[in-house]
From Swiss-Prot:
One of its GO terms (cellular component) is cytosol. Keywords: Aminoacyl-tRNA synthetase, ATP-binding, Cytoplasm, Ligase, Nucleotide-binding, Protein biosynthesis. HAMAP family: Pro_tRNA_synth_type1 (MF_01569). Its EC number is 6.1.1.15. It is found in: Cytoplasm. One of its GO terms (molecular function) is ATP binding. This is Proline--tRNA ligase. Belongs to the class-II aminoacyl-tRNA synthetase family. ProS type 1 subfamily. The lineage of its organism: Bacteria, Bacillati, Actinomycetota, Actinomycetes, Mycobacteriales.
Amino acid sequence: MITRMSELFLRTLRDDPADAEVASHKLLIRAGYIRPVAPGLYSWLPLGLRVLRNIERVIRDEMNAIGGQEILFPALLPRAPYETTNRWTQYGDSVFRLKDRRGNDYLLGPTHEELFTLTVKGEYSSYKDFPLTLYQIQTKYRDEARPRAGILRAREFVMKDSYSFDIDAAGLKAAYRAHREAYQRIFDRLQVRYVIVSAVSGAMGGSASEEFLAESPSGEDAFVRCLESGYTANVEAVVTARPDTLPIDGLPEAVVHDTGDTPTIASLVAWANEADLGRTVTAADTLKNVLIKVRQPGGDTELLAIGVPGDREVDDKRLGAALEPADYALLDDDDFAKHPFLVKGYIGPKALRENNVRYLVDPRIVDGTSWITGADQPGRHVVGLVAGRDFTADGTIEAAEVREGDPSPDGAGPLVMARGIEIGHIFQLGSKYTDAFTADVLGEDGKPVRLTMGSYGIGVSRLVAVVAEQHHDELGLRWPSTVAPFDVHLVIANKDAQARAGATALAADLDRLGVEVLLDDRQASPGVKFKDAELLGMPWIVVVGRGWADGVVELRDRFSGQTRELVAGASLATDIAAAVTG
C-alpha cells in the first residue's frame, strides 16, 4: 500500500504541547498521531490509528493461537449485573454513570466480568463445552480523577480483556499459563521491555495475580526486584519479612514523659536524644499511629488506626490494596473534634483500646519490641511501651512504604526499586463471579459443577504510548517494524522530474513486494521532509535525492542511524525489501 503525504490527513508540530509531561505524550501529538479533545480524551488520527490496529493484530494473533474466540459486548451496560456483584457500589466515583429517559441506571463499562459470566451461563450447560476462552478488544471508560501523561492514563481507552472458563482448578491453571505465555509472545513481538511481577487482585477478586510492567522511569507503578533471586513484585504485593518475637521478661516498665511540643517524629526523636535515655534514639525506635476513616461498600464508616515504625511513611497504594474494596480517608480537624480522645500528634495504643478503635500494625511490630509512642495527652509520650505486654494490636497490615535495600521476602538479598507502566494483568479469579450468578453446568457425573474463571487484560491503547516511551530519541519516534504505520518512509528530496518519477516507480515496486510505503511527495524543502521523517519514526527511510542522477539512493536505518547507498537499478526495490524484512 502506498500513502502519499500530499494526501495524508497529517500536520506535524515543531513545539511540544504545553501540558505534556512525558515523551510519548509530546511525540504522539507533535507527530500528528493523536489529538486531545478534553482531559483524558483523545482522537486517533490516521497514523495513530494504524499503530493501534497493528498492535491489535498482534494481540489477536496470539489470542487466537491459544484458542481464544473474539466477541464484542456493548460499552453501555445496565446496572443490574453490577448490583449482583456489588461492584455498582464498589466502583464509587471511578465510573461514568447515566440514566436513560425512563430513569434506568447504566454505566460505561470499565470491565466486563459480569457480562462474560452471564453470557456463558446462558449459552452453555455441560462440562463438554469446556474449556472455553472468550476475548474482546473494546473501548473502556473510567472517570480518572487526574488523567495524565496523554493516553497512558486516559478516561477512554482500548483494552483487550479475555476470560477463561473451566470446570476445575487444573483447567484454570492451564488457561492461566497459556495466557501468561501468550502475553510474553505479544510483548516480545512488540519489542516492549517488561517485567512480570507478583500483584494483588484488588476489586477483581481471586487468588493468583501477576502484572506485566513496561520498564519506564515515567511509570506510575513502583516495583521491586531482588537481583540475587529474580523475585519481582509491585509494591502493593510485597510481604514484609516478619521478625522473630523477643523475650519480654526483664524489660523495664513503660514510663510516661513530658516531651513538650513534639507532635512530629523528628521533634520526638530530638527530644529523646536530649533526654538522656541511655541510648541513641532514631525514628525507627518510635511508633507512629495514623488514623483513617474506612467505609466498606454500602456500609458505615469506622475509625481505623494504623501503626508503623516512625521511620516509615504509610504508602497510599499499599494501604489501598490492603483495604480493598473499602474507601478510606485521613481524619480531618472535624473528625478529631468529634473524637476528643484522639490527641493529634500524641496518639497511643491505650486510648485506641479504651475506645474500641480497631488497631492494625506493621508486621515488624512483634511481641517483645519496645517503642516510644504517644501517651494520648498533649506534650506527653510513653517510653518503653512493649508490644505483647503493654498493648496488643487487632492484627497486621501491609501499609508501610517499601524501600530500596529492604530484605527480599524470599530472603535471598536486598530489594532494588524501579518504576514501570502496567500493560497487562492476569488473575486466577476462581468462582467469585460464577458464584454471584450461580453459573453451574452439569458435570460428567450428572451433578452441578460451578465454573471457575480467569481474567486477563492488556491495555491496547496504552501500549501505543509505551512503545513510544521506550523507542524514541531526540529526533522523534522510532517504531519497531511490527507496530510502525508503514514499513518505509520514502522521501523525495529532489525537485527534478526524473527523480520524482523514479521515486514514484520505486514506491510502486515496493508495494508489489508487499512493503507498505509512506511517500513524501509534498512540495516542501528537503530539510522539512527529513525532520518529519525522523519525527514520524518509520523504521526505514529511503531518500531519493541528489544522488539519483548518479544512480544512487540512500537507505537509513531509523534505529541504528546508519545510512548506506544502494544502486538505483533493477534490484533496488528487492534490496530495500530484503532490508525491511531482515
